[in-house]
Amino acid sequence: MVNSSVTIYTLPCLSDNYAYVIHNSVSGTAAVVDVPEAGPLVDKISELNVPVTDIFLTHHHWDHIDGLPDLQAALTGSLGQVPARVIGAKADAHRLPALDKAVSPGDRLTLCGIEGDIYDVSGHTLGHLALHLPSAKAVFTADSLMAMGCGRLFEGSAAQMWHSLQQLRALPQD
């Protein structure tokens, strides 16, 4: 997806998952959303040749976080960067890798120079977050909303998932 100075790259990972690289050409930096595995992310970051300032984790499931140690090692190793700031849910911090910044629903966050809003989209898991970047006209929902529906309810209730989907539905259509 391209919107003015922001380009979002969708990277297939594992057998049925995705990671995202958000590139801000104005700041000359990038951010990552979810890290199922490091390889595709390292390849894209290397291709872009920009520093990654932030890594946003939507929830604690292994298929969204397992690549984090390898990505951080590549950033500080072969890519010659400093470690990226790891951001995730304060309510889920005990199940996430060590966070540099814990956020809560309603917080505003800046990733690679782009302002974003944090939403609680519990249902698939408790503490599941969505990241809305209004200026990029993008929202990262992970397993709370997918092309063919919503994720399975591992921890949350149907009522929580319905509330989460209603919040996402209320976002601007573009």
Predicted features along the sequence, with ranges:
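Divalent metal-coordination and catalytic microenvironments
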Residues: 22, 34, 59, 71, ...
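Extreme N-terminal starter segment of soluble prokaryotic enzymes
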Residues: 4-8
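Metallo-beta-lactamase
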Residues: 115, 125-174
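Short acidic-hydrophobic surface loop/beta-edge motif
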Residues: 1, 11, 22, 106-111
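Residues that form or flank phosphate/diphosphate-binding pockets in enzymes
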Residues: 17, 63-66, 148, 156
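Active-site HxH/HxHxD metal-binding segment of metal-dependent hydrolases
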Residues: 14-15, 27-30, 37-120, 137
